[in-house]
């Protein structure tokens, strides 16, 4: 009737320490899981699949710096990529989801003094859509949580970034 639903636990997944975020790729039957201080993991998403995962990429303390927080998927030019927030250095990385899991992009959301908008920092979560949101966001948007709002000096907020700005920075596929 649309008012009631039930769920049944079909399996449990585990990583060595604290899981922080996850995103599912329905097209490829894969679940990506961020382990806060350590790595991004890849698991088969089917209910009867194994419960062991594979490390996609480890936090290296240089580009990907703990805490590993939000995860989202980007599908572009026939490629599926995972976007991750690297809280320890206030940045974002995009990795190919196919081995050898190459880092494709590393970027920051920086201050725009002309518009009075500060950059993002201490991101705990993010998400994106690749559907058009109208003028300025025709290819979608990335939304990131900003833990320290500096312009003006107030509580945390969200930053909305046109996805086409990020897609333009990605290396072209061959």
Residue ranges and their predicted role:
Residues 1-174:
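Sequence/structural signature of beta-propeller domains
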């Amino acid at each position: 009737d649309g008012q009631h639903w039930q769920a049944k636990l079909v399996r449990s997944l585990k990583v060595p320490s604290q899981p922080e975020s996850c995103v599912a790729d329905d097209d490829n039957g894969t679940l990506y899981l961020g382990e806060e201080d350590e790595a991004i993991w890849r698991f088969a998403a089917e209910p009867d699949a194994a419960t062991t995962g594979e490390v996609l990429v480890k936090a290296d303390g240089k580009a990907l710096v703990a805490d590993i927080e939000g995860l989202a998927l980007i599908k572009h030019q026939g490629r599926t990529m995972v976007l991750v927030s690297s809280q320890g250095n206030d940045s974002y990385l995009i990795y190919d989801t196919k081995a050898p899991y190459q880092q494709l992009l590393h970027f920051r959301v920086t201050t725009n003094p002309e518009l009075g908008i500060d950059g993002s920092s201490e991101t705990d979560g993010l998400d994106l859509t690749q559907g058009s949101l109208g003028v300025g966001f025709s290819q979608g948007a990335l939304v990131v949580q900003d833990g320290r709002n500096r312009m003006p000096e107030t509580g945390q907020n969200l930053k909305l970034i046109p996805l086409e700005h990020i897609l333009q920075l990605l290396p072209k596929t061959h």
